[in-house]
Structures are given as C-alpha cells and as structure tokens.
A protein has these predicted regions:
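Class I S-adenosyl-L-methionine-dependent methyltransferase module
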Residues: 2-13, 19-35, 99-183, 194, ...
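Class I SAM-dependent methyltransferase Rossmann-like catalytic core
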Residues: 20-76, 113-121
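Conserved class I S-adenosyl-L-methionine
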Residues: 77-87
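A short SAM/SAH-binding and catalytic strip from SAM-dependent methyltransferases
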Residues: 203-218
C-alpha cells in the first residue's frame, strides 16, 4: 500500500529529496500536456489508481509475446484488438513489428480521467466520478485509503467536481497519439473486457497484464475468457502476456487459436502465462454473475 501523502519532486530542498527520495513523486500533472515527453508521461500516469489498479506501464515489456506472433501468424489485413492497452506504450512496440495489418484497436476501460482545479489544487476523478487523486503545489495525495486525505481535501474535491470547466484527459502516451494522427488504422475505444466485443470480429486479441489472479478470481477470469472466445471467429487467435512478480521470472506469454468452442495452444514462451490453465478451460460454459 502506498503512503497516502507524498512530496512532489523538485518542490523541496534538494538535500531533503536526496535523503528521503522514496517519499517523493514526479508531478502527475504532466499528463495534462499532450506534448509531454513520453517517458515522463508514463511515469506521471503511474500515480493514477483506477479500477483498483495503478496505471503502470512501459515500453519493451512483452518481447516474448511479440515474438510468438511474428513466428506463428501472418497478420496481413488482420483486425487486432489490444485489450487493457493502458497508455499504448506496449502497443507501439508491437506495431513496430507489424506490416500490412488491417486495423489496430486499443481497448481499455479507463482511457480517460477527469481533471478540475480548485483553489490552486488539481483534482482527478475516474470515469465514474470517483475522486482518485489531489495534487497541490508541494504534495500529492490519494484519498482511497486515507481518511485523513478525505478529511483534508474532500470539500475541495466536491467543489472541483462541480465546476463547469472540468475536462476529460486522454490517457494515451504522446507517441501513440502522434501515431494515431497519421495512421487512421490505429484507434482507441473505451471497453470492458467482461462485455461482448461490439466491433468487427478480431483476427487477434491481445491481453497483457489484465486477466491476473492479482485482480480477479478464477471464475471472473474464466468469464472474461469466454467473452473473448465468443468474440473470435473460428481460427482467430488470443495472445496472453504477463509480467510476473516472481523474482527472476522473465515476461511470459502464450498464443492460442480458437478451434470450435475452445482455445488450442499454438505456442508459449519457456514459462507459460499465469492463466494458461484457465485458457485451457475456457468455453466450459461457466459464467460469472458478478
């Protein structure tokens, strides 16, 4: 659990920051600048907690997964859906190795946060209107786990939420935004992985670091896998990847083909993904009722 109040980097004496660096945090307001440095944007975005998880991402996180696709699939003209794409950093790595794909959709339930200012402080809210972060001139704080934070800044958060000039902030990395501007094949959509896919049938669905036992029960993960199975045509593929917390464990991935009403393993990295056993059980008819 994070310390609920942190100091902002660069706003305190340098010696203090050197001695207590772990209590300092980069300014999350960097995400308000669509032209921000991509790496600084990624770091700033990691301060946001939405849906019970922090928006932590980075580049070159799934080299094994990308290699499985390159070695086993021809994606010429393919419709690709990247579920839980976060800010699109890993999608940029994936797209760099693709030629001639048909379309690429970044799908994430939390593509936006809402931002508003009140009395010199920035308040951030998730898509459901829940207050998730406050940033002042020298500190930032998370209200979800702290009654103190809610008591100190709750009134300001309510006032900020009611302001007419509050605006939505797109949580896509500046590099991804520039790519989307010049390549109409790449788009983004708000989507819940537990809901039926509303777009054209994908040839490949990628799910990375989303369907984890860290976040969901096995029953919930199976329900999501059944939904993904239903979205794919026969012969379509599912790519699952995760970055394990096990010390020394490299990124894991598995590529699976829909064959009839189930997934068939095509290839995996040396260590299969965490939910490989659940992928094998998808299509069993079990459902999560919420």
């Amino acid at each position: 659990m994070r310390v609920p109040i942190r100091a902002l980097e660069g706003r305190w004496p340098g010696l203090l920051q050197q001695r207590a660096g772990r209590f300092f945090w980069p300014d999350p307001r960097t995400i308000l600048d669509p032209g921000a440095d991509p790496e600084k944007f990624r770091t700033a975005m990691s301060a946001l907690e939405v849906g019970g998880t922090y928006k932590i991402t980075g580049s070159n996180r799934h080299p094994g997964a990308d290699r499985l696709v390159a070695e086993n699939l021809d994606l010429t003209g393919a419709v690709i859906v990247d579920m839980g794409a976060s800010d699109g950093s890993t999608a940029l790595d994936f797209l760099a190795g693709l030629n001639g794909f048909g379309s690429y959709v970044l799908a994430d339930l939390y593509l936006f946060v809402r931002h508003s200012r009140h009395r010199g402080r920035s308040y951030f809210f998730d898509q459901d209107g829940q207050w998730i972060l406050v940033v002042g001139s020298r500190t930032l704080a998370w209200p979800a786990t702290s009654k103190l934070v809610r008591g100190l800044f709750g009134r300001g958060a309510r006032a900020a939420a009611a302001k007419l000039d509050a605006r939505d902030v797109l949580l896509l990395n500046p590099r991804m935004r520039r790519l989307m501007e010049r390549d109409p094949r790449v788009t983004a959509v708000v989507h819940d992985i537990f809901a039926p896919w509303p777009g054209p049938a994908p040839d490949l669905i990628k799910v990375a670091n989303l369907l984890r036992r860290l976040y969901f029960s096995d029953t919930q993960i199976l329900a999501a896998l059944d939904t993904l199975l239903a979205a794919l045509p026969d012969g379509g593929h599912l790519l699952v990847a995760d970055n394990s917390r096990i010390p020394g464990m490299p990124p894991r991935a598995g590529l699976y083909r829909r064959t009839g009403g189930a997934f068939e393993a095509v290839a995996t990295t040396e260590n299969p993904p965490e939910i490989a056993d659940l992928v094998a059980r998808a299509g069993s008819g079990r459902a999560w009722t919420g």
